[in-house]
Amino acid sequence: MLLMRRFAFLTSSVYFKYIPIYSQYHYSSQFPINMNPKKVAQLPVHNKSTLPPQEIIDLFKITFLEELYPKDQDNEKSPLTEQIQAVKSDLYNRDYNAAFNNDSKRIAYCCRWSPSRATSYASVFAHFPELLKIIRCEIDDKDSNVLCIGGGAGGELVALASIFTLSRDFSSKFASALKIDNEVNKKPRNLNIQLVDIADWSTVVEKLTATIKSKWLYGDSEAESFNVNFTHKDCLQMTEPQDIKIYQGLDLITLLFTTNELFTQKKVESIKFLQRLNENCAPGCHLLILESAGSYSHITINNKKFPIQFLIDTILVGNRKDKGTTGPWSLVSENDSIWYRMDPKLDYSIPLENMRFFYRLYVKN
């Protein structure tokens, strides 16, 4: 997860209560895919293809229980609160290296902002039938491979897991135990998630992955089908042949609240990065880009301001007005302003935040 994406939005919070671990819904067949999602102004609080928002929030409670609910300490004066304030100060000063230079700060950021992001991202992913099929491992009888660039803080990871979990048929493990030989008992396909980030989020990723596997997937074969790998690298510097291999064989790439920062810091390198996607991604790979809606997501070229989505479209798709040409990618869906609003009844000890953004979903030609 690259670094300027860390700014916040706003909603409400409540105190810690009972932690429900699991949803009553567990099969994707209960929730048929809408193959023609409409352009909407606001995403639903809970898409039935994901675990409920409270269960997503609860995963962070369980993972970081000691940090969020310290014994014999006032939450307002806890070490976590102090670290959150330090991260806020570093972000305000645009000192992104300092904001994420140790595990304490990275965990503080994850506790403060990732629950809102994970809940929002889950609704975003579930909005697209193409992405649901990938995350549920329902494409071409093969494993699904997902790359989350700038995904170290866990929002994408937990959102993907909230959909993957509901797609698992947990009756298969009982069939195996009873030696039942039927169609239900065949080997499940794997969801392979690669997270790449310029900061070292390995501790956060390991903690969240362990909780996902123990509390949502219950270990055994279902947990073995959910594979997570973290790479500590700057995506703009991944130019060597061994680095470029990461783009081959992918079904989905996500760039969530990352592109604006890339272009703000290094325009030329960012253009080359997107061009590497043009050259190395296989046909059929999907690319999802989310970014803040409004003037924040503008870049300046030759003293002129352009919406960042205009530049991205041009690099990936080409001149959209020229119907006679085909670019490296085709635009599947777009929206220049859409909201995800948190349910104010959600139980979390830190304020949760709404999200207004634009999105682009592309597919590789």
UniProtKB/Swiss-Prot annotation:
**A Pfam family this protein belongs to?**
Methyltransf_34
Q: What class of enzyme is it?
A: transferase
Q: Tell me the function of this protein.
A: S-adenosyl-L-methionine-dependent methyltransferase that specifically methylates the N(3) position of uridine 2843 (m3U2843) in 25S rRNA.
Q: List keywords of the entry alphabetically.
A: Cytoplasm, Methyltransferase, Nucleus, rRNA processing, S-adenosyl-L-methionine, Transferase
Signal peptide residues on this chain, from the entry's feature table? none
Q: Which GO terms describe its molecular function?
A: rRNA (uridine-N3-)-methyltransferase activity; S-adenosylmethionine-dependent methyltransferase activity
Subcellular localization: Cytoplasm; Nucleus
Q: Which reaction does it catalyse?
A: uridine(2843) in 25S rRNA + S-adenosyl-L-methionine = N(3)-methyluridine(2843) in 25S rRNA + S-adenosyl-L-homocysteine + H(+)
Identification of the protein by name: 25S rRNA (uridine(2843)-N(3))-methyltransferase
A GO cellular component annotation in the UniProt record: cytoplasm
Task: List, in alphabetical order, the GO biological process terms annotated in this UniProt record.
Answer: rRNA base methylation
- Read off the InterPro entries from this record: Methyltransf_34
Q: What is its main location?
A: cytoplasm
Repressor: is it a keyword of this entry?
A: no
What family is this protein classified in? Answer: Belongs to the class I-like SAM-binding methyltransferase superfamily.
Give the source species: Saccharomyces cerevisiae (strain ATCC 204508 / S288c)
What's its EC? Answer: 2.1.1.312
